[in-house]
């Protein structure tokens, strides 16, 4: 050791990999890092502080700084600027609170936590500032909207590219305008970045925002819709269309999060308002519940079907897993054939995105099989007079499946035909909004109920945690009621060479024939012969009828439970508005002051927790 030779660690130069590892250890446990450093050396904690002080302040809203961050992100990983990049967007609950923030660049104070851009504080008096907010119509932000940028390659963490404060009443047009502003910053540049996908979950607001985005850029002439066609195998129906969006001179596709789709399809199956009629077979919740009664052989847990967490990724994965599929084949009666087919078809649809060891030709077959199966299902219901709103998946699920199908096909077309360097591998599981949920989870591990100012403090410090997650190989598949499970960074079984081989148009037409034959064969097993029925389903008069109590939407945040901090702040706000001078006793006024001090202490505690974690960017 150096100390044995009378030497210290001053002035030593450490390899970047060692520096990064020390940084990660410091984030996890400062005490453990101090012990490690006393034996093996490493930067001081103050050195990491100095490195962090050189990092630019992260700002809210869409600004030109987003391009600089994205460019530096690509440079840090040696990634070419013309390489494909993926954007993910999602939102989560935010603690409604206004906090002061000093900007050292402009040398001004701003109020953080209001919907939209930060508001400059121009009054010294709190009453005058409150009046300013009332006059301008500002409201507190109740939701955080966050965009990530992803280099879609193995073991590369995402980058938080932008955040914005919104409210639950923010409409889809406003969300679309934010997306358009970000695309303009990144793509309308002298050296534009190559965005190939923008992904989100399947919430209604997100799907509507994508539609508004397309309508906006097309109406202004900054974008156009390109349509690729695949010949329909039945020879009678119109060709399959794959829409692409050319915006700011580049082509991208709109996709949905595949894991969100899997949870939506599970929730549809568990809905008491629906019973899936698949020819001679009916599929419903009780069939899945019966599987869990076989405790000796069931691949499912009781919590997967009873008092279930609708956001549990692992439970949805277990339902559509090969183990559950094998159980339905080997241990259930033939009357459950509909359940087997449902799990097979739509489980394969998600696997087309999530599988790490299949070729793109197999993925094409899997997504097209799901499309043809769904179209034939609609045709059967129409022919039999069954209303879709009771015997088919929900409209939301139907739309999400269509977007998944066209999204994967669109990614294949873009990688094959539109990239300057067509040798870039396509890894579909890196596209979507899973990285956004991962960022939200890391934030809540630091502060369970954060304000917008907390977000601005945390975002620059998440890089090390994301890097550590990308190197982690530990996943708890059997864990129950565990919420989100993030696997987009797992690539161990991925053969990179197979992801650079894309089928030609002629091959895709042939694969469509294979997928169509498989879909028709599955329907023949179910007792329906679709050979003489057009696969383009007709609309039904009853489609517009709403079914009560059928709320399969995933557009809710599992973290919105009221925390002590939120409850305390809400109570203080109500009391401040209802306070009338002279109407409150000295004791009550003293109690209110103590509650205010407690709220301030909670805020300071959260800030000190951030400092203890020492999540500094070692760049």
Predicted features and spans:
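Basic, short loop/linker segments at the boundary and entry of helix-turn-helix/winged-helix-like folds
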Residues: 1-21
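Electropositive nucleic-acid engagement tracts
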Residues: 5-11, 28-129, 205-210, 215-232
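Eukaryotic intrinsically disordered and solvent-exposed regulatory patches
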Residues: 8-9, 21-23, 32-34, 69-75, ...
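Short, charged amphipathic recognition helices of the HTH superfamily
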Residues: 26-38, 191-195, 275
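Short, well-ordered loop/turn elements at secondary-structure boundaries
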Residues: 30, 42, 80-83, 143, ...
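Beta-strand cores of modular interaction/reader domains in eukaryotic scaffold and signaling proteins
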Residues: 34-35, 86-88, 93, 148-150, ...
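Non-catalytic regulatory appendages
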Residues: 136, 151-153, 157, 161, ...
């Amino acid at each position: 050791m150096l100390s044995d030779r009378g030497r210290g660690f001053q002035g030593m130069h450490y390899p970047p990999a060692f520096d990064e590892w020390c940084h990660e250890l410091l984030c996890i446990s400062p005490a453990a890092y101090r012990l490690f450093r006393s034996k093996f050396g490493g930067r001081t904690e103050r050195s990491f502080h100095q490195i962090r002080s050189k990092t630019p302040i992260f700002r809210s809203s869409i600004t030109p700084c987003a391009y600089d961050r994205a460019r530096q992100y690509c440079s840090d990983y040696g990634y070419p600027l013309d390489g494909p990049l993926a954007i993910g967007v999602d939102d989560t609950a935010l603690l409604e609170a206004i906090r002061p923030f000093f900007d050292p660049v402009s040398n001004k104070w701003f109020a953080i936590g209001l919907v939209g851009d930060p508001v400059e504080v121009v009054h010294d008096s709190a009453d005058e500032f409150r009046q300013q907010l009332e006059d301008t119509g500002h409201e507190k932000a109740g939701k955080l909207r966050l965009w990530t940028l992803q280099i879609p390659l193995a073991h590369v963490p995402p980058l938080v590219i932008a955040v914005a404060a919104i409210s639950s009443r923010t409409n889809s047009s406003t969300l679309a305008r934010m997306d358009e502003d970000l695309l303009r910053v990144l793509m309308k540049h002298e050296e534009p970045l190559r965005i190939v996908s923008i992904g989100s979950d399947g919430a209604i607001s997100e799907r509507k925002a994508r539609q508004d985005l397309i309508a906006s850029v097309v109406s202004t002439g900054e974008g156009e819709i390109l349509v690729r066609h695949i010949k329909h195998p039945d020879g009678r129906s119109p060709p399959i269309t794959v829409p692409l969006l050319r915006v700011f001179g580049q082509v991208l596709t709109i996709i949905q999060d595949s894991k969100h789709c899997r949870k939506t399809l599970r929730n549809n199956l568990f809905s008491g308002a629906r019973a899936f009629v698949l020819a001679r077979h009916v599929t419903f919740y009780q069939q899945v519940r019966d599987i869990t009664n076989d405790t000796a052989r069931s691949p499912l847990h009781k919590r997967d079907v009873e008092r279930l967490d609708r956001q549990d990724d692992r439970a949805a994965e277990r339902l559509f897993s090969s183990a559950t599929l094998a159980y339905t084949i080997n241990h259930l009666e033939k009357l459950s054939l509909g359940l087997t087919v449902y799990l097979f078809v739509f489980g394969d649809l998600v696997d087309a995105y999530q599988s790490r060891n299949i070729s793109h030709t197999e993925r094409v077959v899997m997504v097209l099989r799901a499309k043809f199966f769904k179209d034939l299902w609609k045709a059967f219901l129409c022919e039999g007079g069954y209303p879709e709103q009771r015997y088919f998946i929900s409209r939301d699920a139907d739309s999400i499946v269509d977007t998944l199908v066209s999204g994967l096909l669109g990614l294949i077309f873009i990688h094959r035909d539109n990239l300057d360097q067509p040798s870039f591998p396509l890894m579909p599981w890196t596209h979507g909004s899973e990285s956004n949920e991962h960022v939200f989870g890391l934030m809540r591990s630091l502060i369970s109920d954060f304000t917008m100012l907390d977000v601005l403090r945390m975002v620059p410090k998440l890089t090390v945690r994301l890097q550590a997650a990308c190197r982690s190989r530990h996943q708890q598949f059997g864990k129950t009621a565990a919420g989100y499970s993030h696997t987009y960074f797992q690539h161990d079984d991925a053969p990179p060479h197979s992801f650079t081989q894309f089928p030609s148009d002629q091959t895709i037409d042939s694969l469509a024939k294979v997928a169509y034959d498989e879909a028709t064969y599955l329907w023949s097993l179910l007792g329906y012969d679709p050979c003489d029925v057009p696969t383009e389903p007709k609309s039904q008069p009853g489609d517009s009828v709403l079914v009560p109590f059928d709320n399969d939407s995933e557009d809710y945040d599992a973290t919105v439970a009221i925390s002590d901090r939120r409850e305390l702040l809400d109570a203080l706000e109500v009391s401040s508005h209802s306070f009338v001078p002279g109407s409150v006793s000295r004791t009550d006024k003293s109690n209110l002051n103590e509650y205010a001090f407690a709220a301030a202490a909670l805020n300071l505690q959260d800030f000190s927790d951030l400092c203890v974690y020492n999540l500094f960017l070692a760049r």
